[in-house]
Amino acid sequence: MKKILLALLILPCVSCLNQTVNMETTFLKNRTFDEVWEASIKAVNDIEFTIDSIDKEAGFIGAERGRHVLGGDAPPRISIMVKEDDRNVSVDCKVLQKEQFIDVLGMGKKIVREFMIALNQNLN
């Protein structure tokens, strides 16, 4: 019985880990690509991320925050895609943790929310 209980306690600890990904998309009407692009850059800076990759033609912004979580080197990475179609502009915000970090505290969802709030503030 003790061996079964021990196995049940250890099994979750040795299971395969997936990289933590949190994503949200917002659609903005009556905004130009350039307005949303500039607001997105400001929003990334407002939430204290450092932009390390940017391509306006592709609509891509990549950034990283240099924080260490729980004594480990697992800074979150954010990827922003700004796209324009006939009627509106969309913004995809994706946050992922490097090095198979488990997002126990829900940091990824919080970062997505912070970015979306900062984006809306910069557009108003």
Annotated model-derived regions:
Residues I4-V14:
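Sec-dependent N-terminal signal peptides
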Residues C16-N124:
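Ser/Thr-rich, low-complexity intrinsically disordered terminal regions
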